[in-house]
Regions:
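Non-catalytic signal-transmission and effector/linker regions of two-component phosphorelay proteins
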Residues: 1-7
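The feature encodes the CheY-like receiver
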Residues: 18, 60, 87
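Charged docking surfaces used in two-component/phosphorelay signaling
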Residues: 19-27
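Short hydrophobic/Thr-rich beta-strand motif most characteristic of the beta2 strand and flanking loop
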Residues: 29-37, 44
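Acidic catalytic/metal-coordinating carboxylates
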Residues: 37, 63-66, 90
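Short amphipathic alpha-helix used as the core "switch/output" element in two-component signaling
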Residues: 43, 62-76
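Active-site beta3 strand of CheY-like receiver
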Residues: 48-54
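Active-site residues of response regulator receiver
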Residues: 56, 83
Length: 90
């Protein structure tokens, strides 16, 4: 891991979206790790320190909202939640 670079964890079950975000962040000189699920993200969070998490809301198993609550109970890291949903449900 390179020192002095902002380390971002990208969590998304969609390979295309995850790879697009990773590529953009890498191109802009950020250090990027990725996870394909909440379980994978928890493993990465136990191994590394992150400065920011970019997290998909709608994932199979544990949602991004549920994972956010868990993360916030144990660490103080900024989280950006993303969704591909185009409509608000009542």
């Amino acid at each position: 891991m390179e020192k002095n670079k902002i380390h971002i964890l990208v969590v998304d079950d969609d390979d295309r979206i995850r790879d697009l975000i990773k590529q953009y962040l890498n191109d802009n000189n950020f250090m990027v790790s990725s996870a394909i699920s909440s379980a994978d993200a928890k493993t990465k969070l136990s191994q590394f320190r992150f400065d920011l998490i970019v997290l998909d809301v709608m994932m199979p198993g544990q949602s991004g909202f549920e994972l956010t609550k868990e993360i916030k109970n144990v660490m103080n890291v900024p989280i950006i939640l993303l969704t591909a949903k185009g409509e608000v449900e009542s």
